[in-house]
Amino acid sequence: MEVIEIKGIPLASRQPVVLAIGKFDGLHLGHQAILRAALGGVRQSEVKNSSGESVQLSVMTFWPHPLWALLHKPGYERMLTPPLEQTRVLHEMGVQRLFRVHFTPEYANITAEDFVFTHLPRMGVMQVVVGVDFSFGRGGKAGPEDLRGLCEKIGIPVQIVPPVAMAGEKVSSSHIRNLLAEGQVKEAAVLLGRPYTIVGQVISGRSLGRQMGFPTANLADSGSYVLPVAGVYGVEVQVDGGKERWLGAFNLGSRPTVHGHGLQAEVHLLNFAGDLYGHDLRVSFLTRIRDEQKFSGVVELKRQIERDVEEVRRLDRSKNG
């Protein structure tokens, strides 16, 4: 997949594309519906395309999150799918070209007319696909129907995709953020269509887990991922993006029993032997085991960790049969 960074007016391209536009934070089921509609547009456009070049499925997205770039809204400095993770997932979903807009107050000041009449034609756009909540132009005052009306003037059709609902509630990134803030990782996975995943590099720690018989990998917090609420989770882990997966017990919190400080993340992998220091771990959240707790001492903490690990083993047994 080709990634094109946009910091102003896009460079001119003759490559024809069907363009899905949105923040796509999380790439949840609603976003996936937009991408499926865009893929349908690609197939239709290939029939009509007279240039001889294949039409590419393309996405335009924005980074950092507009709510952070413009308002510094707390929490939105982190994303459900930061740029690297978003790129990986979009590639897996079959997107061929990604236009990533560096979203700034200056970019936000572009008028709706400039966006449609200047930007889109330079990107080789044959069709645009957006969701019903899409907004654009100065102050975000223009919506999907405004986009359709402007694009009609230059012969670009616009498809507006209705929202996806689960249990009577619209699937949205903000809803998923709220679920993670409550530790409801199973429910978040339903809306995402996959487990919620973060990536972190293993850093050195105090080796307290190893002293208790449960060696853990301590993960650096890059500050880019939305994190679930503190607690203990059953997770699945890949090392350096490899295909092999290990179940693990993941702890996120301040480790009050051993006088920890600040938010720390660590994971104990079941049936793993090896040195993980310096490696990147992809951690997918499967279930929440318990809240963070302060115990009377290390002995009680060790007993609880044993119970946590046994809970993860039960996950393995239920998964395999």
Residue ranges and their predicted role:
Residues 205-321:
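Phosphate/ribose-recognition catalytic cores of enzymes acting on nucleotide-derived substrates
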Residues 10-77, 82:
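N-terminal catalytic cores of NTP/NDP-binding nucleotidyl/phosphoryl-transfer enzymes
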Residues 28, 90, 128, 188, ...:
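Residue-level signal for inorganic ion chemistry
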